[in-house]
């Protein structure tokens, strides 16, 4: 356990961090009751690599053949990180939403719709990049309109 913590605390780069996440993903698939508490702890860590690992380890390259956690579990780990300022965490949020869409398209779209404004531009781009073009364009338009409304509302509050 101590070695596991050391490696995730100070990876040399995102590739090394994600290679570890692939291992954690396999462990999580086999021993969810043992691994999930660690992922939840990492989700609240001040260390951005741990926060990233807390979500990337849930569904590392989703395929229907793999045993995945529930969508509820995955989204409960993603949601607290929606506003994360770290670029690598933002990318992971988008990437995991994209991967979740492969397994749970309906639930993922509901989540995206609900959190359109909460996602950073990076997360939004990654999350929507594999959607059908017309659907992706609708999400972009919705995001644009909601941001415009929010801006107008904030301006009206200043006056």
What would you call each of these model-derived segments?
Residues 1-159:
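Alpha-helical scaffold domains
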